[in-house]
Regions:
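Acidic/polar, low-complexity intrinsically disordered N-terminal segments immediately downstream
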Residues: 20-107
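Glycine-rich, often proline-containing surface loops adjacent to acidic residues and nearby aromatics
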Residues: 73-79, 138-146
């Protein structure tokens, strides 16, 4: 019985301390965007902004090493990559439209597209194996490899 009374008294004390007069929480502003679009170095920047407005997914050709390796629970240091040439992003976007974007409705993409799509000219693991497309460790990133002017030379079968 004494333990119960002690617990009740302790609970009342914590409750009384929690009800102090403090200033209200101020206005919390909106958070800035993670990436600034357009990135400014590609003729395809307008198309990339349109995709972001439609799908809320960043298509990035300019990013930093921490952007590339970041994961929610671990980092992804197992890839070596080379950035894509910004001038060939129109070719890359045409390719992505043909094999991905045109296959589903805009509503589907808006709901299920990864948060960011990082485009690389070359990407391979530290073991030397190539990954043509892979999800990042954070579950929000998608990496697309082998993006260059060569994409426009692919046939429909390839």
């Amino acid at each position: 019985m004494k333990k119960i009374n002690l617990y009740l008294i302790t609970l009342c004390l914590f409750g009384g301390v929690a009800c102090t007069d403090e200033d209200k929480v101020g206005d919390v502003g909106t958070l800035p965007q993670d990436y600034v679009l357009p990135q400014g170095e590609s003729p395809a920047d307008d198309r990339i902004v349109e995709y972001y407005n439609s799908y809320k997914s960043y298509i990035l050709y300019e990013y930093t090493q921490p952007d590339f390796i970041y994961g929610l629970s671990q980092t992804n240091n197992s890839y070596i990559y080379e950035k894509v040439d910004p001038l060939c992003m129109d070719v890359v976007l045409d390719f992505l439209e043909d094999i991905w974007f045109d296959l589903y409705l805009t509503e589907f993409h808006a709901k299920y597209m990864p948060y960011k799509i990082m485009v690389a000219k070359s990407m391979e693991t530290t073991y030397g194996t190539r990954a043509y497309a892979t999800m990042g460790n954070d579950g929000q990133s998608f990496y697309v490899n082998d993006c260059s002017e060569e994409l426009k030379n692919l046939s429909a079968e390839e």
